[in-house]
Amino acid sequence: MIITSAFSEVDIPDVTLPEFVLAGVSDRGAKPAIVDGASGRVLTYAELALGIRRCAAGLAARGLRPGEVFAIMMPNLPEFAIAYHGALTAGGVVTTLSPLATVDEAAFQLADTSARFLLTIPPFLETALAAADKAGVEQVFVLGAAASGASAFSELLGHGDTPPAVRIDPSRDLAALLCSSGTTGWPKGVMLTHRALVAALVELDRLAPFGERERPICPIPFFHMAGQAVGMNKVLRAGATVVTMPRFDVEEFLALIQRFRATAVLGAPPIVLALAKHPLVDRYDLSSLEKVVSGSAPLSAQLQTACSERLGRFVGQAYGLTETGLIISASPHDGRPARPGSAGMLVPNTEARVVEPTTGADVPAGEVGELWVRGPQLMTGYLGNPEATAEVLDAEGWLHTGDLVRIDADGWLFVVDRLKELIKYKGHQVAPAQLEALLGAHPAVADCAVVGRPDEAAGEIPVAYVVRRRDVAGDELISYVAERVSPPRRVRAVVFVDEIPRSPAGKILRRILADRERGAVRLNS
């Protein structure tokens, strides 16, 4: 059964991403576009527009040809938007790297995308230069002063402010080559056209519109799909002002909300967790906040409710993949209350099926199955990897997400877990996210993750890694979960740790914990 959005279809304009995002820039002049929270430095819309034109002109003068790749390896800074849209305006394609990537990780992405240019900042220059050398990147730029092997970014902006005249087909030409998370091996390059990224923004705006008076704070990284699409492009399209953070620190985050009177938080579950449970929250004036939006990973009903009750504000979710150009569903910002634990409702122009993973047959309405989606925001495939593309994108245009979901009778979507992350306990499928939601509701638990431990008798047993808020015994937590789930879904062991490994986007890096479990089993065997 094909499920369609409850919202009427929207028109997707036939324009490039910069044309769409920057359509109203000339009318905004001295209005702040991006505020660097760490320094207080402000980039106005006039400065943004001029910087983008200069960047495009500079890249053309340096030899960037349409379709060639410009890489950005930096945290959330105003120059990110200048470089991103400057490269696209010049006809280039952008790939974004985590500034915390190792030399090998960065070199892999640079080589895989055939990047010709790379922009970074001084603290990451050594890694960037080593990676660029391994990958054959021709030119490296750095913010601030030039350094050995790297030109100053300001030099790139010194070739006038007339962008090159390039022809871009929004439906065919790529805007971004973004890497999948890489939590299970080397990442894959996700090919996204201008039209796909424009479609995602138009669709999301139907459910969650932004106005020019908004002042969201965005701790999630711009190099991540959610950060650049919502924290940067959606905000700039609306003519709003975004307050950025180079990294998340709870005290700095709260202070910035108070200082800049932020109206919204664009975050991920760890940020919602801090707002719901951290004692520092009570020391700051957060009365300007109107909403909190969480993405990048599932947010439990308990945590969503706890945050909403503490702040007295709307707390919603959005769901999507890099492969879906950002968005599949979102909590509507239309006055109705968010449904706790739900990732919202399908955005317009999007179709979905919920299927039995092994057969592809549709499951009965309201039951759990793998989510397949189809819409104009989807990727065209994985770069240079037709085999991997064929595994997830079928001939009828359905993207097989690998996520287990259910969609209720009212059209609200609930993410149950990743198909590949299910723990197989004596033939039963155990969803780690369900157990994490239960454990996260315990007052002594600050953070947690659940993975499978190889077991000769059971196949795998669920093991909880827990960061304690206060003293608590593992047996108490095991009993707490056992009282709330069926026997196959009980946690069988608890490991206390100082922190849960997460990606910069807030996703639990289960591979690290799973590797630890496999290593422990080998040592004990």
What are these regions (language model features)?
Residues 237, 254, 259-266, 276-338, ...:
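Gly/Ser/Thr-rich phosphate-binding loop
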Residues 42-46, 175-199:
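Conserved AMP-binding A3 loop
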